[in-house]
Amino acid sequence: MNQIEQKWQYIWQEEKAFEVSNASSKPKYYVLEMLPYPSGKIHVGHVRNYSIGDVIARFMTMQGFNVLHPMGWDAFGLPAENAAIKNNSHPKKWTYSNIKNMKKQLKSMGFSYDWSREINSCDPEYYKHEQKFFLELYERNLAYQKESFVNWDPVDNTVLANEQVVDGRGWRSGAIVVKRYLKQWFLKITDYAEELLNEIQNLKEWPEAVRSMQEKWIGKSIGANFHFKIKDNEETTIEVFSTKPETIFGASFIGIAFNHPIIERLVSKTPEILAFITQCSHITRSSELEKAEKEGVFTGLFVTHPFDSNIVLPVIITNFVLMDYGTGAIFGCPAHDECDHELAVKMNLSIKQVIKADMDVQKTAYTEDGILINSDFLNGLTSNEAKQEVIGEFEKLGIGKRSVNYRLKDWGISRQRFWGCPIPMIHCEICGIVPVPYKDLPVTLPDDVNFDGHGNPLDHHPSWKHVNCPKCDKPAVRETDTFDTFFESSWYFTRYCNSNATEMTDKKACDYWLPVDKYIGGIEHAVMHLLYARFFTKVMNEQNYVSVREPFKGLFTQGMVLHATYKDEHNNWLYPEEVVKKGNEFFHKESNNRVVQGRIEKMSKSKKNLIDLETMQEQYGADAIRLFVLSDSPPEKDLEWSASGIEGCSRFINKLEYMFKAIDSLKDDVNSEVNKELNRLVHFTIKHVAEDIKHFALNRAIARMRELSNAISAEISKDKIDVKTVRHGFNVLVQLLNPFIPHITEEIWQKLGNKERLYNLSFPAFDESMLELDTYIMAVQVNGKLRDTYEFKTSVSEDEIKQVTVSLPKVQKFLEGKEPKKIILVPRKIVNILV
């Protein structure tokens, strides 16, 4: 099988089978799988993703479309830098070696990529365009620098990504990670929050789950911003944001984030306060803060109620108010908010009910809307009426106004890493921040770098960062941060339209190809990559790089590939190939010690539940792997890897070769009867396989083709064979299977004597008239119970059906000589005789 696959891969390469032109009279179709990170090896999860895309690409080509199906590499990132530290070598060497190997693997799977459009995000010829784009954003005030919290490893003296913080400690040093303010670069994605939110409803071909996740991530909240005066210091106020300002008369405290600026200005830092701030700063993710047990510490400050100066509220530092949401301060209404209630119970704060409820708010917060009580001028109003009224009062008093807040925050793009695209800015003591002139782009990474694992190598480099200021020509320093790698993947799909364009995009080519018709990838990218790509497309549209404002017309999110996990007696993870099954138990192949089978989980390096692709290819071939990952489960569902499943797919491919040999040896028999049912099934399969592929029901399409192959095999085994229909049916079967298993089908097609390649052929056509059955079978019931079945010709009338079924011996037995009261017909399905 490997020889056949290599043969066709060579032919496709020599014939440039999948290279497409930007100038074609055919309608366009752009199918794209999310580009991979070059980690070194393609894994089975990749194969499933790319096999889905390949079926769609090949099918749409057969449907007469000019199909763009490109591939490239998301090549910057932390793993390359970690490998550089480990091996004391440049990450470029590691990355390019991995790309070479993975490209070879992708070609060996027979994927129909247009490799002439390949992109590599760590190539200066690629990232010079995004450096220029960043400068354009800066000119439009869409890029800016400010201080922000980062995860700081005090031993390695470096910033850590969230995934590098394990149980609150640095992954390399083991040091307790702290929050630290550093200057970071941001993009103003929040300027586009409303458009990003509103246009979600137009993404009709996106999964509802992804659309919902983006809506929640953007998180639009309508409420009010207003001020509380500090008691005994009325010149100073704390501004809060609330989505429920109508509950103001239920306020019992002010909650502020642990890093709220007023703490530095007015709060005396007692040991208790310092300890609490430190505790909060060790939590590295906002999601962890939100899930944590609600805690707080009193600051010693009080504020006065905006509508009653006799009411004073304590100001409390909490671990659930976040500085990057709203204003970093809230008023706590424990009776009507769960977080506030939990803290109030713990700190013995008052719980005052201000919305009618048939429950005890001292025990549980009532969080629904209702009628206001205990609320002065708001009493008797509905929640919505009270909200409008109280905001009006804030505006009259000049202490607040209606406001809209978004959970979405500006995108922090700074990474204190080496292996990324350099941010093209210069810091001058005289001129401040100065953009690198366009003529000096790209700013490239140095080759002579020391990777000792401590700090950012760019910051420590003896010469790279030192440069003269473009404005005053005095000594200055380069920005040593690099772009978040999501920067590269937020526009790469536009580059495929013409990967040799001298500018960021070829506008004419983008006008032809964009938007991407079908984008395929994991749902884990719903609120990061997919949102950033939508944001970039809108800005690129305004910069006249593209005409569209949405990048992906259709989105398909495939399920994960799963495998059982195994551990030995010492609790060490084992690879599947190290384990053998004997009866219902598992044992280590070498030691023969008992092995414990764990949960079936997503394949991962850490748990070693991986399948080596190259081993599988040697054993079964690429076509069998492709067929298995597409046939065993709907593409949107998770797929459990099974040896028996891929063996079954391998047998099916071998069966196709056997069928070819058997059919090739047949001689025409003019006396054989025409197998109308087989002919009908051929046309039925053509029609429904096309529909299944269009709806991504690829496993169902494969099941239909297996059914057709079984019917052809059954006909071959007869004494009198309808050779003409068998040959036609087999030809159709080979064509239908080609998008799924392209190597063996091209080989069989050639052996059948065909000169043209399958990849150049149109999808088989079906004849609608052939789908009609000459006969059909109806269930015959008496008083709703099945008593017989009968085969009728399609031309029979309802009266004839009634006469025939009533006279059937098995029916007569239950009629007992009585006349039917009524006969109910469900056309072509059921006759129900009532007596």
Swiss-Prot record:
Name of the protein: Leucine--tRNA ligase
Enzyme class: ligase
GO MF, any single term: ATP binding
GO CC annotations on file: cytoplasm
Positions of ATP binding: K605
Record-linked CDD domains: Anticodon_Ia_Leu_BEm, LeuRS_core
Motif 'KMSKS' region: where in chain: 602-606
Organism superkingdom: Bacteria
InterPro entries on file: aa-tRNA-synth_I_CS (IPR001412), aa-tRNA-synth_Ia (IPR002300), Leu-tRNA-ligase (IPR002302), Leu_tRNA-synth_edit (IPR025709), M/V/L/I-tRNA-synth_anticd-bd (IPR013155), Methionyl/Leucyl_tRNA_Synth (IPR015413), Rossmann-like_a/b/a_fold (IPR014729), tRNAsynth_Ia_anticodon-bd (IPR009080)
Record's keyword terms, sorted: Aminoacyl-tRNA synthetase, ATP-binding, Cytoplasm, Ligase, Nucleotide-binding, Protein biosynthesis
Transmembrane segment boundaries: none
Pfam families tied to this protein: Anticodon_1 (PF08264), tRNA-synt_1 (PF00133), tRNA-synt_1_2 (PF13603), tRNA-synt_1g (PF09334)
Catalytic reactions of this protein: tRNA(Leu) + L-leucine + ATP = L-leucyl-tRNA(Leu) + AMP + diphosphate
'HIGH' region (motif): residue ranges: 36-46
Compartments where located: Cytoplasm
Family under the similarity heading: Belongs to the class-I aminoacyl-tRNA synthetase family.
